[in-house]
UniProtKB/Swiss-Prot annotation:
The keyword Zinc does not apply. Its EC number is 2.7.1.6. It catalyses: alpha-D-galactose + ATP = alpha-D-galactose 1-phosphate + ADP + H(+). It is an enzyme of class 2 (transferase). This is Galactokinase.
Amino acid sequence: MNLKEKTRALFAEIFGYPATHTIQAPGRVNLIGEHTDYNDGFVLPCAIDYQTVISCAPRDDRTVRVIAADYDNQVDEFSLDAPIVTHDSQQWSNYVRGVVKHLQQRNNAFGGVDMVISGNVPQGAGLSSSASLEVAVGTVFQQLYHLPLDGAQIALNGQEAENQFVGCNCGIMDQLISALGKKDHALLIDCRTLGAKAVSMPKGVAVVIINSNFKRTLVGSEYNTHREQCETGARFFQQPALRDVSLEAFNAVASELDPVVAKRVRHVLSENARTVEAASALEKGDLQRMGQLMAESHASMRDDFEITVPQIDTLVDIVKATIGDQGGVRMTGGGFGGCVVALIPEDLVPAVQQAVAQQYEAKTGIKETFYVCKPSQGAGQC
């Protein structure tokens, strides 16, 4: 039974009438462009075929009733006519409530909804299960009540809910790719303008995500420190963001910067250039060049941005040794653990899976989790 069938069956069973719509919003993986988003730079994510699915129907009153199928059918119920506040014990409820509260501030022309939610985006793997939930909930209200909101506005609404209601600082990439993703394509996103260009993925290439299942604590504080170092770099060049600094300008004065700040700046500037070039390499089907750019990205994250860990570097080395120049692999996500992403010809996937299974646990004492994904369509009816 797939997620659509599961949520529709549960909807009829619990609410006693059939759902009118089923909406999905996908998770994502970022192929290249790491820690560039909050520097107003470029990212190149694709939506993946793991998603949040919501079966729903409009109500004729002002009540929102929500069932979380993945949390033992926990229930949340709130009124659109009372101030929406955080739930004291159900964290998942706050993503739903936050999206609805911020939607009210954007366009209040909607009434109550019944919904049943289920998803298969792995949680805590950096594949954006929360953004997928936020975008799915926003799309439910937009579709049921024909709200004049486009994908970018639904994405921004989700980001606001996560930043201001849930209280988690995030860029816009995760919500934007979930809302705007295109089947068989990646999306080159300009994080300053929110402009997005679809980039076709070469045929016969698998998107492989491998979770190292290693996570260092203090990730939040490390993230903030790196962000501050980038802002210090932008101030040095008297620019609003590192997006506005050229590599030439940086190289001319790099020795005058604090050495650590200089390394952080060099990563962001070189990563932005790599990301734009990667989009054109993918478009041309040049997997070899894409692989080189992913390798350079990983080395830059390891040596200049200093956000990789030995477990992640080991995983990258195992995959690289197996695929040679026939694809690419790098750490993806915030850093200090998490996942690697690889672009691999489909016929090489079994060899990569076998090599990782044989070597990673032996070298690190941790068992990996392996996902093979397809670039998928963004949010909408399913």
